[in-house]
Amino acid sequence: MVRSDWRAQEIRRVMTFTGSKEKTARDALEKFDWNVEVAIDHILNTPQVDLSGASKVFDKYRNADSDEIDLDGTIQYITDLGLSLEEPTVLAVAMTAGSPSVGTFTRKPFVEGWAAIGGDTLPAQQKLCRSFAESMTSLNADFQKIYKFTYGFLLQEGQRVLPQETAVDYWRLLLTGKYEHLDKWLSFVTEKYKRNISRDAWNMLYEFMLFQAKDPSLESYDEDGAWPSVIDEYVEFLKE
């Protein structure tokens, strides 16, 4: 028996035993060096996600000339989700569906991202969006993931730092109602700091908000700690 026939037989064995499709059987065998027993065990113990529903949602909005959802499709999609383009929940959608940049979705991350959490229809995605909105009302772990995602999502091709104006707009969008000193921070950034915003500065502001919530007087703030210089300058600004 030639090697290719041997592999085909092993694939059929796995398919027969697990009821899986050929691609699933082949992928499992290749992953585990063609060990049939291990491949079967892996398939039987790994939940299989149906991608067809989320793929149909993607097809409804994708550009007819390319396998992606462009700006026009994105606007219609967000509207059909029951969202406004100017609300922070849109960022949770972008993160979930692996949007590479503002106004664009590509098939694989969109389909896999939604399918993984049960978003296989538009109504299911609408329901999940309501859950996203509820989870974004405070500084919690879910919100932190979205906050950190936002920085890279907003960077345009060739950019390494976020323009100050963009950062200010999205801080206002994300942090209103969550950070009581937001107006002071934005005043500091626009009137004294006057520079573009690095990823480190963006991320560490979140950590500083948590720190300040526990120590409003900032008595325990250590300028020699791991804080970036922008936070050091902000603390000086607050104490003036």
From Swiss-Prot:
On whether Hydrolase is a keyword of this UniProt record, the answer is no
Q: Which cysteines are joined by disulfide bonds?
A: none
Indicate whether Amino-acid biosynthesis appears among the record's keywords: no
GO terms of biological process kind: protein neddylation
Any one GO MF annotation of this record: ubiquitin conjugating enzyme binding
Q: Which InterPro entries does the entry link to?
A: DCN-prot (IPR014764), DCN1-like_PONY (IPR042460), PONY_dom (IPR005176), UBA-like_sf (IPR009060)
User: Which keywords does UniProt give here?
Assistant: Ubl conjugation pathway
Q: Enumerate the SUPFAM superfamilies for this protein.
A: UBA-like
Instruction: Report the residue ranges that make up the UBA-like domain in this protein.
Output: 7-44
GO cellular component terms attached to this protein's record: ubiquitin ligase complex
Boundaries of each DCUN1 domain copy?
Answer: 49-239
Explain the purpose of this protein. May contribute to neddylation of cullin components of SCF-type E3 ubiquitin ligase complexes. Neddylation of cullins play an essential role in the regulation of SCF-type complexes activity.
The identity of this protein, by name, is: Defective in cullin neddylation protein 1
Q: Which organism is it from?
A: Yarrowia lipolytica (strain CLIB 122 / E 150)
